[in-house]
Each structure stands twice: as structure tokens, then as C-alpha cells.
């Protein structure tokens, strides 16, 4: 399994990594999550991402990892816990990481990301939205000094605003989801450049666009799905023609496309079908 250095962290991670959203109860039975996770680790994957907002993903992952003794990089996030969640409470943020450490059975978190730092209506992280200042930065600094976390990051879903937070230069890694894939490429215009300016590691989530690129939808594209615009339909048709010409499956092509971009260090794939 090919490995890269994740930006300025110096961490060596596999280009292909495991996303933890559907390790949770959303993904089905525990045994299925366990099988998928341990199989991924046995095949060489050494990086898994999770979050408190992913239901019971941290607890499930922690339980699974009791059966794994190999090296592993884990990222988790701040956001959504404890309830009622107050992103302006440094005490609550530190408490959330203490819970993550307990659930994951870890002494420290390799990468702690701020979840949705680019969506103020989701989580009001900042007291100064122009310079990206707030108690969350104080909490991160304290936890680094205490050895609770090693590196900090951003996990977001916008393209323009997330790039602006990257340009603050205050974070080591950026995880962008839904913004870079075969047919959605907004991240390449701003996020990748901002990350490069600050030597950040770049992680791309959902290369299959949460299912849009997991299987072919020929009938829907050609005869149904009235909510899809004609330009988008033509994109899908062109993609399907390319698949026919190359004989490659859509999942393989989708992951190969993202992972081959030199601006991308690591690609997260889900654990469920």
C-alpha cells in the first residue's frame, strides 16, 4: 500500500484510508463494520477518520481496534458533543476530546479536526470570523501541550470558505468532502492551493460522492430523475462512455481519479456498500 507524508505533520499515511461515518449504527451490524475495518487494516491501510458527530462511530471503532495491534493514525473531530453543544466553551471542547480518547482507547489523538469550521450556522466556532479566532484555538493549544493531541486540522464541506480558513495558516491538515471527485471538482480551484501555501496535508472524503459515483444510473440519467439538469446529465453520459471505452468499473475510476492528483495526499473511502 503506497504511503505519503501528510503535509507538515510528518505522519506517514496510506494514500487510501477509511472513513468512519458508516462504521456507526448507520452502517448496519457491528460484525459487518468489524470485518470491513480489520480487512482494511490487514490490507495495509493505516489511517482512519471518525468524529463525535458520526453517531457511535468512535465507540464502534474503539471496540474493533481492541483486536488490532499494528500502527495506526486516527483523526477525530470537535463538534456536536457534549450536548447541549457550546463551541465557545473551552472546557466542553476539552471534555469532548477526553471522551474521544476513552472511546477510542487511545493515549492521544493523532489529528484533531474542527468539524465544519466553514459553516457558521452549523457550529459557531469563531469570536472573530475574519481572523478565525476563538476558544477552540485555545483548547487545541492546551491539548497539544498536554499531549492529548498531536496535530490539528479542518474537516469541512464547502469550497470557498474552507479555503479561507486554511489560509489562516493555523492548521496542519484539511479534510474536504464532496468537493473533489470525477464530476465535482470545486476543491481544486481554492482549497488545494491554500493547503499548498501552508504545507497542509490534504485528505479528500467521499470520492464516490455518497453513492452518485458508486454505481451506474444509466436509466435515470437517460429517462428519469427530472431534478438533474441537462448539463449534469451530459457529464454522466460522457463518464459512462469513458467507462465503456476503458472497461473500467466506476468505483475504480472514481478512486483512481482522486488519488492520482498530486495535490491530494489521502482519500477516504466508506466502510459500507
Where are these regions (language model features)?
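N-terminal binding-site loop/beta-alpha segment at the start of enzyme catalytic domains
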Residues: 1-76
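Short amphipathic alpha-helices and their capping/turn segments at secondary-structure boundaries
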Residues: 1-9, 61-67, 93-104, 189-200
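Structural motif corresponding to the early beta-alpha repeats
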Residues: 67, 71-91, 114-118
Amino acid at each position: 500500500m503506497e504511503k505519503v507524508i501528510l503535509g507538515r505533520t510528518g505522519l506517514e499515511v496510506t494514500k487510501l484510508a477509511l472513513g468512519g461515518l458508516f462504521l456507526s449504527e448507520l452502517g448496519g451490524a457491528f460484525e459487518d463494520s468489524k470485518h470491513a475495518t480489520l480487512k482494511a487494516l490487514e490490507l495495509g491501510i493505516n489511517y482512519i477518520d471518525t468524529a463525535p458527530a458520526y453517531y457511535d462511530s468512535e465507540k464502534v471503532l474503539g471496540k474493533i481496534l481492541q483486536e488490532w495491534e499494528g500502527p495506526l493514525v486516527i483523526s477525530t473531530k470537535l463538534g456536536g458533543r457534549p450536548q447541549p453543544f457550546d463551541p465557545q466553551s473551552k472546557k466542553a471542547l476539552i471534555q469532548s476530546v477526553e471522551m474521544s480518547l476513552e472511546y477510542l482507547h487511545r493515549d492521544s489523538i493523532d489529528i484533531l479536526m474542527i468539524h465544519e469550521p466553514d459553516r457558521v450556522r452549523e457550529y459557531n466556532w469563531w469570536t472573530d470570523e475574519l481572523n478565525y479566532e476563538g476558544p477552540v484555538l485555545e483548547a487545541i493549544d492546551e491539548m497539544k501541550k498536554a499531549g492529548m493531541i498531536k496535530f490539528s486540522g479542518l474537516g469541512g464541506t464547502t469550497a470557498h470558505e474552507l479555503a479561507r480558513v486554511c489560509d489562516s495558516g493555523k492548521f496542519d491538515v484539511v479534510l474536504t468532502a464532496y468537493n473533489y471527485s470525477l464530476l465535482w471538482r470545486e476543491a481544486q480551484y481554492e482549497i488545494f492551493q491554500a493547503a499548498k501555501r501552508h504545507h497542509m496535508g490534504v485528505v479528500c472524503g467521499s470520492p464516490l460522492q455518497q453513492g452518485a459515483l458508486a454505481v451506474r444510473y444509466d436509466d435515470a440519467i437517460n429517462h428519469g430523475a427530472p431534478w438533474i439538469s441537462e448539463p449534469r446529465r451530459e457529464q454522466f453520459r460522457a463518464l459512462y462512455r469513458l467507462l465503456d471505452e476503458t472497461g473500467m468499473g466506476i468505483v475504480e475510476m472514481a478512486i483512481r481519479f482522486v488519488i492520482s492528483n498530486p495535490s491530494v495526499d489521502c482519500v477516504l473511502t466508506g466502510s459500507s456498500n
